[in-house]
Design a protein with these regions (language model features):
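Hydrophobic membrane-insertion alpha-helices, especially the h-region
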Residues: 7-20
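Serine-esterase "nucleophile elbow" of acetyl-processing enzymes
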Residues: 24-80, 95-98
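Structural recognition of the beta-strand scaffold that forms the well-ordered cores
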Residues: 36-38, 73-78, 104-109, 157-162, ...
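Surface-exposed cleft-lining segments at the edges of enzyme active sites
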Residues: 79-84, 115, 122-138, 170-173
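Oxyanion-hole/transition-state-stabilizing segment in secreted/luminal serine hydrolases
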Residues: 89-133
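Active-site segments of SGNH/GDSL-like serine hydrolases
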Residues: 146-179
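Substrate-gating cap/lid alpha-helix
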Residues: 166-201
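Histidine-centered active-site loop/cap adjacent to the catalytic His
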Residues: 215-238
Length: 238
């Protein structure tokens, strides 16, 4: 019995360094490898960029160029045409929920389709009642999305991008007023949640030529997505 006892103790002591170094290796890997998940619509997806990178691909490149001792992997889950209720349905799917639990940073860009589609598919003319009803539903969906994402990983940061006026070179004061209203409401919602940062995108295209920064009436081209990527870099410390 004594021989067996001594043998068991010897095995236990032999395993201690293995367990320690295994734990240390896992901790080191988690500190040097970071995962970023992007959620949203065609803007997150990067529609309109000839390089098919959008602002997410460009941001990943910029972040990894900045960090030499830490690597960032970006996972783009953006779906063209997606509205906030559809995003809610997406993030509760088992495979997506599993991904969310492993993320260190989330980037959410949603709401453009809620605004445009509920106005009839474009922004000309504007329908006040429909837009205000859509905003109410959107904010409810955003609140639930932030709760779900925040619960998936309580240590992760969440970046929420504001909306922009897609007609910066037109006489679009009325559109601008609604975009500002939605953005202000988004900022108020963001403040209710922990580890969530709001990043404005509306100033990016003001005073700039539509044909130089847009692929079509709504989506940026490569230069436009570059502006968004730079904006995030300036407002969030990866």
């Amino acid at each position: 019995m004594k021989v067996l006892k001594f043998a068991a103790i010897a095995v236990l002591f032999a395993l201690i360094p293995v367990i320690y170094f295994s734990f240390f290796a896992d901790e080191t890997e988690s500190s040097t490898k970071k995962r970023v998940i992007a959620l949203g619509d065609s803007l997150t997806y990067g529609y309109g960029d000839k390089k098919e990178e959008g602002y997410i691909g460009r941001l990943e490149e910029k972040v990894n160029q900045q960090h030499t001792k830490r690597s960032y992997h970006f996972q783009n889950l953006g779906i063209p045409g997606q509205q906030s209720d559809q995003l809610l349905a997406q993030i509760v799917k088992p495979d997506v929920a599993e991904d969310l639990s492993e993320a260190d940073v989330f980037i959410i860009n949603i709401g453009t389709n809620d605004l445009i589609k509920n106005n009839g598919g474009d922004l000309f003319p504007l329908h006040h009642d429909e837009i205000m009803d859509a905003k109410k539903d959107f904010l409810d969906h955003l609140d639930k999305t932030l709760n779900i994402v925040g619960t998936a990983n309580k240590d992760a940061d969440i970046i929420v991008l504001g909306l922009y006026n897609p007609y910066p070179d037109k006489d679009s004061d009325k559109i601008e007023a609604y975009v500002d209203d939605w953005n202000k409401s988004m900022m108020k919602e963001v403040k209710k949640h922990e580890n969530v940062k709001y990043v404005s995108t509306n100033p990016l295209f003001k005073g700039k030529s539509k044909e130089n920064y847009f692929h079509d009436s709504l989506h940026p081209n490569g230069k436009g997505y570059e502006l968004i990527a730079d904006r995030i870099m300036k407002n969030y410390d990866f």
